[in-house]
Amino acid sequence: MSRPGRVAVLGAGSWGTAFAAVMGSSTSPEGRRADRIVLWSRRREIADAITLGHRNPEYLPDIDLPENISAVTDIHQAVSDAAVVVVAVPAQHVRETLTTVKDSIAEDAIVVSLVKGLERGTGERPSQVCASALGVPPERFAVVSGPNLALEIARGEPTATVVASESAETAEAIAAMTAGRTFRPYTNTDVVGVEIGGIVKNVIALAVGICDGQGLGDNSKASVITRGLAETTRLAIAVGGRPETMAGLAGLGDLVATCASPLSRNRSAGRLIGTGMGVDEAVASMKQTAEGIKSVSAVVDLARRHDVEMPISEAINAVVSGRLEVATLADLLLSRNLKSEGHRA
């Protein structure tokens, strides 16, 4: 990859904005970091606030953004001449967004996904959707995932993450663009495993949030987290991921952060559902997408196609689809036949 120069970030929510701030404050040498980052926002008032006041008043109102960040509402303008295009829109909008802008993206641009959800209907991971919508080859695609709660990153709290690409060179280039005083990227080539870890943890976080909303204790939540990791690992292996990825930042790390933090959208949505709020009402009460609710049916469908047993995900899918009362969920979360422990069990 030549000098990064200009970066486009599609999506000015909390994570897209925080990631733009990470790239804008990279401590990598000149030539390995971006000169300018342009956020794309659907809303004019947010774009103007970012460009003129260097703040995102809707999603990160108390965070000062680097001076090299601006925002626009014209998506074609955002990606024009960008060496790197970062995708930070909800999973169900990735295909539509990229199809719209396909002809404006440079042929040699690297596409980076921050998306943590499966596309409903196709069951495709973000990397597959990007490849289908843009025709981007694997060596020009990367995914960033890990215990990356946007507000903590924007505050400058120490965080580690994973940059995965089938091309080690591409992963290293994106890692260099994001490395900073408090942001430490690691690289690997397991795109599938990294994506599955980021996708399924949202479903497990819903389950933990429901347990919390029902007043269940730490034993219950720890059990769900641990067995949730096991079923995530089973699915990752079945679709081509590596088990060691699930023991790292993109698996265990992301799962723990998302299940434990009150900043987690999915845990928060689960907690609301656990207190008796309807799923639609819980979704409507949140500013941003809880990807677990949107993706759980696709996760379950993918698991069934590969004959992978995922009892926690199955139970959450039943709740989200209205086939199971939340009051009966706790009895089902760990209701499997007795067997030995392990991700293959």
Where are these regions (language model features)?
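NAD(P)+-binding Rossmann beta1-loop-alpha1 motif at the extreme N-terminus of oxidoreductases
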Residues: M1-I63, I69-T73, T100
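Generic structural signal for well-ordered, non-membrane alpha-helical segments
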Residues: A12, G16, R43, V94, ...
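Short, well-ordered alpha-helices that flank and scaffold nucleotide-derived cofactor binding pockets
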Residues: A21, S25, L52, T99, ...
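Rossmann-like NAD(P)(H) cofactor-binding subdomain of soluble oxidoreductases
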Residues: L65-P158, I174-A176
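Internal alpha-helical scaffold of NAD(P)-dependent oxidoreductase catalytic cores
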Residues: H93, S104, V129-R140, P158-L206, ...
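NAD(P)-dependent Rossmann-like dehydrogenase/reductase catalytic/cofactor-binding core
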Residues: V208-D212, I237-A247, G251, L255-A345
